Amino acid sequence: MSGGLDILSLKEDDITKMLVATTHLGSENVNFQMEQYVYKRRADGVNIINLGKTWEKLQLAARAIVAIENASDVFVISSRPIGQRAVLKFAKYTDTTPIAGRFTPGAFTNQIQPAFREPRLLVVTDPMTDHQPIMEASYVNIPVIAFTNTDSPLRYIDIAIPCNNKSAHSIGLMWWLLAREVLRLRGTISRTVEWPVVVDLYFYRDPEEAEKEEAAAKELLPPPKIEEVVDHPVEETTNWADEVAAETVGGVEDWNEDTVKTSWGSDGQF
């Protein structure tokens, strides 16, 4: 698939990332259409995915995405929580349209509802959980790219990228690799320069674990320094209220003394 070019071949660093993220570990069951991507079966029953074919299908999917003139016509979908953050990050760097969370039924087929969309290409995280958009895409002839495990059904899927889509690290790494390959084909980044965006941004983080990490980080912080408060001597203040009251009492005249008491009755006038 790489055409014999070394620059397009799978690098050792990428292989190491895939092995650490358990991208090569499939499930114990195998769909008959996924047998071509299985390297061998371990003694414990786990099927090993051929990472060479994974890389070839990843490059094919990236070329299909780049072939769409308007990037917003490419819809990336993930109903599973472990892939929602990766989908949002992928859409951010590739200018595609994300659908993270529940998919509204009829979004591709019912023209009456406000959520109606007309994408030209779909990229889904799991064919099992994202079966609704895949089914609707088949009604309106929309090609579908999917990250598939060894037990995933390939009905209505045009490009299957074999990988472990049940691991948060694996699915995050695959979305990161796909985004990097898309940007390389567009010419946004060079193949000789490492992409500065780290793969950790695509990993799903459990909210409870994140809260525990924040609490543990706060415990490791040193206690805040308490500044000593210096008591300054307070000057004695005069009670101005007493002085004002004394002056007021001393200066008041008895107005009753100057008042001329006139008896209207003595003058005989009424």
UniProtKB/Swiss-Prot annotation:
GO terms for biological process: ribosomal small subunit assembly; translation. The keyword Iron does not apply. SUPFAM superfamilies: Ribosomal protein S2 (SSF52313). One of its GO terms (molecular function) is ribosome binding. It is found in: Cytoplasm; Nucleus. Gene3D superfamilies: Glucose-6-phosphate isomerase like protein, domain 1. The keyword Ribosomal protein applies. It comes from the Eukaryota. Keywords: Cytoplasm, Developmental protein, Nucleus, Ribonucleoprotein, Ribosomal protein. PROSITE patterns: RIBOSOMAL_S2_1 (PS00962), RIBOSOMAL_S2_2 (PS00963). GO terms for cellular component: cytosolic small ribosomal subunit; nucleus. InterPro entries: Ribosomal_uS2, Ribosomal_uS2_C, Ribosomal_uS2_CS, Ribosomal_uS2_euk, Ribosomal_uS2_euk/arc, Ribosomal_uS2_flav_dom_sf. Its main location: cytoplasm. It holds the Pfam family Ribosomal_S2. Belongs to the universal ribosomal protein uS2 family. Component of the small ribosomal subunit. Mature ribosomes consist of a small (40S) and a large (60S) subunit. The 40S subunit contains about 33 different proteins and 1 molecule of RNA (18S). The 60S subunit contains about 49 different proteins and 3 molecules of RNA (28S, 5.8S and 5S). Interacts with oho23B/rpS21. Required for the assembly and/or stability of the 40S ribosomal subunit. Required for the processing of the 20S rRNA-precursor to mature 18S rRNA in a late step of the maturation of 40S ribosomal subunits. Required during oogenesis and imaginal development. This is Small ribosomal subunit protein uS2. It comes from Drosophila persimilis (Fruit fly).
